[in-house]
Design a protein with these regions (language model features):
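Gly/Ser/Thr-rich loops at beta-strand to alpha-helix junctions
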Residues: 65-70, 97-99, 151-152
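A contiguous loop/helix-start segment that scaffolds small-molecule binding in enzyme catalytic cores
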Residues: 58, 139-229
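Short, well-ordered secondary-structure micro-motifs
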Residues: 28, 72-73, 103-105, 128-130, ...
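Class I SAM-dependent methyltransferase SAM-binding "motif I" and its flanking Rossmann-like core
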Residues: 3, 71-140
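Class I S-adenosyl-L-methionine
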Residues: 1-91, 197
């Protein structure tokens, strides 16, 4: 958590968020009024936050990582913009630390060159479009970071992406896997493109597939920037 995010939470009189995320910061929000909702209730959650802000409350909407990266920042702005101008609350987007940044630091330095971030969740994005994006990024030799790589319902998506990338990259291309990045229970393993789907991967896992230049040395992934050594 960034210092600015911590300050925003401490200054708020209402804290809104996914129940799991509120539990992660329970020490910071003790004594504050909270609005917690379950997964798949994002619109309702953010609408309640906007309504509370219109009433004059100092509201914080909690996201994991960075609210502007697969978080609630965009939805809050969209809903706030529907409020008449004379009542519209101001919205500040507080930067956070995205899981891709934390996972990269755990693995070494895999993001030193161009990279893409792709979510494999097809709840709001067609799976064919996700595969197309993965294909284009693989063709462009970009390091590919995968959010939401596997769930109880999505058991084959990661294998399909692996097959797409294998069309363009060596099977021994390094792949880093980090579970619970930056949280208690963090676990890291470095595998390769041929075998990484055999590792334990879930919704709390971030996968980083190296590019054609990525290598592993002394247990760390490195994607060279191109400096002459």
């Amino acid at each position: 958590m960034t210092p600015q995010a911590r300050e925003a939470i401490l200054a708020a009189d209402r804290v809104v968020g996914y129940l799991t995320y509120l539990d992660l910061i329970k020490d910071l929000i003790e004594g504050k009024e909270t609005v917690g909702t379950a997964m798949m209730q994002e619109v309702d959650r953010c609408q309640q936050a906007v309504d509370l802000a219109v009433e004059g409350h100092q509201v914080v909407v909690v996201s994991s990582g960075d609210s502007g990266v697969y978080g609630m920042a965009g939805l809050v702005l969209e809903l706030a913009n529907k409020v008449p101008a004379e009542k519209r609350p101001s919205v500040d987007i507080v930067p956070g630390l995205s899981a891709v940044n934390v996972a990269a630091s755990v693995l070494g330095a895999p993001l030193m060159h161009d990279f893409a971030v792709i979510s494999l969740s097809d709840l709001m994005t067609p799976w064919d479009l996700i595969k197309k994006r993965a294909d284009v990024c693989a063709q462009g030799d970009m390091v590919i970071s995968l959010y939401n790589p596997r769930s109880k319902k999505r058991v084959t998506h990661l294998d399909e992406v692996r097959e797409i990338v294998l069309k363009y990259r060596d099977p021994k291309t390094p792949v880093g896997i980090v579970q619970k990045a930056g949280r208690p229970g963090q676990h890291m393993v470095i595998s390769d493109l041929e075998n990484f789907t055999k590792e334990e991967v879930d919704m709390q896992t971030l996968v980083i597939i190296g590019n054609s230049q990525t290598y592993v040395e002394n247990g760390r992934m490195i994607t060279p920037r191109g400096y002459k050594l």
